[in-house]
Each structure stands twice: as C-alpha cells, then as structure tokens.
Regions:
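Bacterial N-terminal signal peptides that target proteins for export
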Residues: 1-6
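Residue-level signal for mature regions of secreted extracellular proteins and peptides
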Residues: 13, 73, 93-96, 112
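C-terminal motif of bacterial Sec signal peptides marking the signal peptidase cleavage site
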Residues: 16-19
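Secreted/luminal cysteine- and crosslink-motif detector
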Residues: 21, 81-84, 101, 120
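N-terminal pre-ligand scaffold of iron-sulfur
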Residues: 23-92, 125-156
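Iron-sulfur (Fe-S) cluster-binding segments and ferredoxin-like electron-carrier domains
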Residues: 86-94, 105-113
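Short cysteine/histidine-rich metal-coordination sites, predominantly Zn2+-binding motifs
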Residues: 94-103, 114-125
C-alpha cells in the first residue's frame, strides 16, 4: 500500500510540475502619441511575449510583441484569424509557444506575425521600424476594433 501511495504521489507531483511551464504573461497598456502614432520600444523585448493593450472607446485591442529565438522582434494582433470572432480567440504564451485559447492550436514564437491566414495571430501589416522602435498608425490599429468587440482575452 505504501508503494502505491508513493508512486501515486510521485505521478501527481510530476503531473502538476509539468504543467508549470512558463505561463506568466506580461500585460502593458499603450496609447497613441500627439502625432497619432503608437510607438513600441523593442530594445527590452525578449522571448517572453508582451501583450500590449490599446483602448478605443470600450474595446481593448491587444497586440503581441515578442523576440523570436532568432533575435527578430515580431508583432501581431492577439486574435486568431480563424477562430475570431469567438470571445476566446486569443493567445497566451507557454515556453517558446503561443497557444490559441479557443482551439488549442500551438505556434512557435518565431511564427508570430509571419503568416497571413490560418489559425494564428493576425499579422500587423502596416508598421515601420526606426531603430529599436516599431511605429503603428493609430487609425490602422483602431481599424481592428470590430475584431475585438467580443474578445475576452486577459488584459492584466
């Protein structure tokens, strides 16, 4: 009986510890500047994704910014292209992957913002890069408001 309890405890401990992969996500609020630009500083972006909340009226539009394992900074809207407009069509990070909370599809962080179409985060197609800054126009970001109208992703 003691052997069974030992192995059961060991199995449960392994089960709970294996679920403790890196899942703490970082959420930040962003705003547009006086020139109607959203400026994202990238020098401190790491392989741990940052989820950036931009508020327009009563809707939160969320962006994912992450540095891939190849060193390239990537950005995308945090809504799944296929699962949207489901309220659960958003991603969280677990280790080097992001996972759709609606369908469970998993992507390596190197794919964030790289693929148009399919079950992955919506690419940010209108952006400019100046040194360590990604610059987006306020009007472009706000044009995605309808995609986030029923969105229920985490914001903090």
């Amino acid at each position: 009986m003691n052997k069974i309890l030992f192995y059961l405890t060991l199995a449960l401990g392994f089960f709970f510890l294996s679920g403790c992969e890196q899942t703490t996500n970082k959420y930040l609020d962003i705003t547009a500047n006086s020139e109607d630009k959203i400026v994202i500083e990238t020098q401190d972006v790491t392989t741990k994704a940052e989820f950036l909340n931009y508020k327009v009226d009563d809707v939160t539009i969320q962006l994912i910014v992450v540095r891939g394992t190849d060193g390239k900074v990537r950005i995308a809207f945090n809504t799944c292209q296929v699962c949207s407009p489901s309220p659960k069509a958003y991603f969280i990070q677990s280790g080097e992957y992001i996972i759709c909370q609606n369908c469970g599809t998993k992507f390596h962080i190197n794919k964030v913002g790289e693929e148009k179409g399919g079950c992955n985060p919506t690419p940010v197609e209108e952006q400019t890069t100046e040194g360590n800054r990604i610059i987006l126009s306020k009007s472009y970001v706000e044009s995605f408001k309808d995609k986030f109208a029923d969105w229920q992703g985490q914001t903090n």
